C-alpha cells in the first residue's frame, strides 16, 4: 500500500531578473503548457497524494485562478508566506517558506522549487526512497551543469560519507561559472537544487529553528534562513539522517525572460529523445 506523501512547491517569490512576472507561468511547451504544469506532469505519476503551493501575496491569486482546489483529481492547497514589511525587506527565504505550510503538511513530503524542471525520474527516486528507508533524502547535481553562464547564483555543496549519507551542505552564494577556483569549488562538485524528501518531524524541527532565527535576528531586514543550511545543521546535530541519490534527469530552469524560449527548445529536445 502506497504511503501518503505531499508535493510542496515554493512559488512565493517574483524575480526582478524576470521582470517581476511569475516564472512558473512561462510557456515551455508548444501547447502553451506552463513551466509549473510541466513540472507537475513529471511529478504526479510518482504517486503524490496532495499538492501544496507556498505562495506570496503577488502569486496567491494567479495560482488559485489556475489550479483552484484540485489538479488532475489530486487535492491542491495553498500556504501564504508572509512577512512584516515594517521589519523586513523580503521574506526569510526557504525555511520560512516551508514553515508557512506547516499546517497544510500532514505527513511526509517532497519540497522543491517551483521554477525548476527536475525530471520525472527525480521525483520517482525520492518517492520510492520512502518504501525502503525512514531516512530523509535528496538528489545531487553536477555543479558545472547547473550554473548560469552569465549570472551569479547560490548553490548548496554536499559532503557525503562512504554510504552516501549527507554529512554537510554548505550554502555558497554569488557563484560565478568562470570563478569557481577563486572560492575553492570545482565543476564536478555535487550540489543541491533544493529538492528534498522530509518527514513531518523534520518540519517540526525546522519550525523551531526558524522561530529561534527570527528572535535572534529580529531587526535584520535582509538576513535569510536557507533550507540546505538548516538541514545540514540538523544532520550535524544527529537529529536527521539523509541519503543522497544521483538523478539521470537533466534539470532546466528559467532565470531571465529570454530563457523561456531556450527552455522550450530544451524540453522539446528532451521529449523527442525519450521517443
Spans of model-derived segments:
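Active-site metal-binding loops of divalent metal-dependent hydrolases
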Residues: 14, 115-116, 143
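Residues at the starts of beta-strands that form the adenosine-phosphate
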Residues: 49-51, 75, 108, 135-137, ...
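Hydrophobic packing residues within well-ordered alpha-helices of enzyme cores
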Residues: 62-67, 126, 206, 263
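Short phosphate-binding loop-to-helix
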Residues: 71-108
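Short beta-strand-to-loop acidic/aromatic patch adjacent to the donor-nucleotide binding site
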Residues: 107-117
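Conserved core of the sugar-phosphate nucleotidyltransferase
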Residues: 119-204
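Conserved alpha/beta core of the MobA/IspD/sugar-nucleotide pyrophosphorylase nucleotidyltransferase superfamily
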Residues: 169-172, 177-275
Amino acid at each position: 500500500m502506497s504511503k501518503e506523501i505531499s508535493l510542496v512547491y515554493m512559488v512565493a517569490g517574483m524575480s526582478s531578473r524576470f521582470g517581476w512576472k511569475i516564472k512558473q507561468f512561462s510557456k515551455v511547451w508548444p501547447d502553451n503548457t506552463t513551466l509549473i504544469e510541466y513540472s507537475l506532469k513529471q511529478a504526479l505519476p510518482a504517486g503524490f497524494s496532495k499538492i501544496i503551493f507556498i505562495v506570496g501575496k503577488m502569486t496567491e491569486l494567479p495560482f488559485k485562478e489556475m489550479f483552484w482546489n484540485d489538479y488532475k483529481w489530486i487535492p491542491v492547497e495553498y500556504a501564504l508566506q508572509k512577512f512584516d514589511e515594517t521589519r523586513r525587506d523580503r521574506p526569510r527565504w526557504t525555511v520560512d517558506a516551508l514553515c508557512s505550510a506547516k499546517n497544510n503538511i500532514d505527513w511526509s513530503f517532497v519540497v522543491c522549487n517551483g521554477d525548476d524542471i527536475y525530471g520525472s525520474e527525480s521525483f520517482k527516486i525520492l518517492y520510492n526512497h520512502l518504501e525502503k528507508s525512514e531516512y530523509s533524502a535528496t538528489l545531487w547535481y553536477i555543479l558545472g551543469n547547473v550554473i548560469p553562464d552569465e549570472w551569479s547564483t547560490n548553490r548548496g555543496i554536499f559532503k557525503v560519507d562512504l554510504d552516501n549519507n549527507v554529512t554537510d551542505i554548505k550554502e555558497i552564494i554569488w557563484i560565478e561559472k568562470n570563478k569557481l577556483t577563486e572560492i575553492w569549488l570545482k565543476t564536478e562538485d555535487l550540489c543541491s537544487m533544493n529538492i528534498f524528501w522530509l518527514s513531518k518531524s523534520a518540519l517540526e524541527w525546522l519550525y523551531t529553528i526558524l522561530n529561534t532565527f527570527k528572535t535572534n535576528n529580529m531587526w535584520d531586514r535582509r538576513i535569510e534562513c536557507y533550507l540546505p543550511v538548516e538541514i545540514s545543521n540538523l544532520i550535524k546535530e544527529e537529529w536527521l539522517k539523509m541519503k543522497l541519490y544521483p538523478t539521470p534527469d537533466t534539470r532546466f530552469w528559467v532565470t531571465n525572460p529570454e530563457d523561456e524560449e531556450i527552455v522550450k527548445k530544451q524540453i522539446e529536445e528532451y521529449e523527442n529523445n525519450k521517443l
